[in-house]
């Protein structure tokens, strides 16, 4: 008689009970009776890839973007910006052409994800004033880059009463600029309830396929398709804030380079 495995449910038409032969805690799944389908679905989770069925080995999650090849490369940008009411912009897809782990091999690569880490803070004079200031962040994809530098915040976004919190992409630029992610952070000044700095820690999946020209330098003017831009603006008209950020992009080189 063949032996039964430990995680098989034994039940028969004549029996009025079901048993589960494993040594799990009785409090994990006490509410509902487990099914064979649920156990089979979880049984391959913590096994190595060569011991999983063929379906799990063939149809995997898209770790590497379509049309790209490994290894995963990393490029970091350390910057300190004076964020004003009129806004500031930084290009976060500047990658130099080369053979290193931080370089692109050819013209094409795909930015799979971006990691924004840092803080926004006020100086000694501004944090003593009673006010609340919010910094708006817009992660924008420029599908057709043009010129030597990115367009300013006021040129890209349409605002009511010059308020960055009401910023939307202008109608004639909606096919070129796409807001992929939008978030904000708040600082408060004053003698009571002061919050002079706010930490930032954001991770986004973007899957942006960037195309350069034949130049090697990491510049905005060398982009031909899909430049990734980070726009920042504060809501207070007279009190600026400072942003100390470390931005990391994780990208893969394209196969067709």
UniProtKB/Swiss-Prot annotation:
GO terms for biological process: symbiont entry into host cell; viral penetration into host nucleus. Keywords: Capsid protein, DNA-binding, Host nucleus, Metal-binding, T=1 icosahedral capsid protein, Viral penetration into host nucleus, Virion, Virus entry into host cell, Zinc, Zinc-finger. A motif (Nuclear export signal) lies at residues 101-122. It is found in: Virion; Host nucleus. Belongs to the geminiviridae capsid protein family. Homomultimer. Binds to single-stranded and double-stranded viral DNA. Interacts (via nuclear localization signals) with host importin alpha-1a. This is Capsid protein.
């Amino acid at each position: 008689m063949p032996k039964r495995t430990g995680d098989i449910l034994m039940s028969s038409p004549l029996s009025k009970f079901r048993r589960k032969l494993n040594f799990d805690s009785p409090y994990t799944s006490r509410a509902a009776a487990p099914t064979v389908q649920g156990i089979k679905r979880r049984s391959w989770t913590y096994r190595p890839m060569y011991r999983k069925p063929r379906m799990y080995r063939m149809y995997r999650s898209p770790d590497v973007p379509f049309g790209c090849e490994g290894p995963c490369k990393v490029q970091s940008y350390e910057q300190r910006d004076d964020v004003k009411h009129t806004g500031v912009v930084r290009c976060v897809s500047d990658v130099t052409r080369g053979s290193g782990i931080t370089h692109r091999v050819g013209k094409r690569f795909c930015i799979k994800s971006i990691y924004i880490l840092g803080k926004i803070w006020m100086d000694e004079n501004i944090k003593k004033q009673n006010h609340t200031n919010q910094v708006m962040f817009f992660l924008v994809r420029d599908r057709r880059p043009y010129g030597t530098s990115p367009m300013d915040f006021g040129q890209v976004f349409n605002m009511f009463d010059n308020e960055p919190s009401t910023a939307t992409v202008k109608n004639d630029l909606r096919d070129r600029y796409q807001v992929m992610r939008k978030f904000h952070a708040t600082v408060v000044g004053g003698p009571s309830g002061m919050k002079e700095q706010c930490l930032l820690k954001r991770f986004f999946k973007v899957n942006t396929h960037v195309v350069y020209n034949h130049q090697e330098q990491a510049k905005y003017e060398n982009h031909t398709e899909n430049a990734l831009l980070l726009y920042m603006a504060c809501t207070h008209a007279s009190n600026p804030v400072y942003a100390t950020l470390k931005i990391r992009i994780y990208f893969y080189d394209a196969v067709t380079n």
